């Protein structure tokens, strides 16, 4: 997560907002809460959401939303943000949906951060197909995290960088 800190620790981000889709137990949420003025943390699993709240109980700039982003609803309940951080399902269809929904909730000039980019080929394919489809409105800003060849959780080897940051317009 050091790359997130490097990218967003500048004072200009202190007044900005981030939408974190799939906050799990709140570890990344904690980092984001120190970088941004407002954090909206989305999680479908009630137990994980409660863990995230407990882990971040001293961080008062986090709002939690319990929502299954794949339950057929669009992200209508979610606010517009300067950054959207996604660590959801990793299959092609889900990633494509996440990216399409992200730009509906992203300010121009904002960023989409995709976690686990180098672990799942379907995620990587969906990202690159989406970039092509957006015809210049989405560009690769930078790759982040562990590099190709690194060993990740459960011994899985990265086939590319751990994460990717996309710039919108």
Enumerate the predicted regions with their spans:
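S-adenosylmethionine/decaboxylated-SAM
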Residues: 1-169
């Amino acid at each position: 997560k050091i790359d997130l800190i490097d990218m967003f620790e500048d004072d200009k981000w202190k007044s900005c907002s981030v939408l974190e889709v799939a906050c799990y137990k709140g570890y990344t949420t904690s980092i984001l809460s120190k970088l941004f003025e407002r954090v909206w943390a989305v999680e479908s699993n009630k137990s994980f959401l409660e863990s995230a709240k407990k882990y971040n109980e001293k961080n008062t700039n986090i709002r939690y939303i319990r929502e299954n982003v794949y339950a057929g609803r669009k992200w209508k309940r979610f606010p517009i943000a300067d950054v959207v951080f996604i660590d959801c399902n990793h299959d092609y269809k889900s990633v494509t949906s996440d990216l399409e929904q992200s730009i509906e909730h992203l300010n121009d000039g904002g960023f989409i951060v995709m976690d686990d980019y180098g672990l799942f080929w379907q995620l990587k394919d969906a990202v690159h197909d989406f970039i092509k489809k957006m015809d210049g409105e989405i560009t690769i800003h930078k790759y982040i995290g562990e590099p190709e060849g690194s060993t990740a959780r459960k011994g899985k080897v990265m086939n590319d960088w751990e994460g990717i940051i996309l710039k919108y317009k």
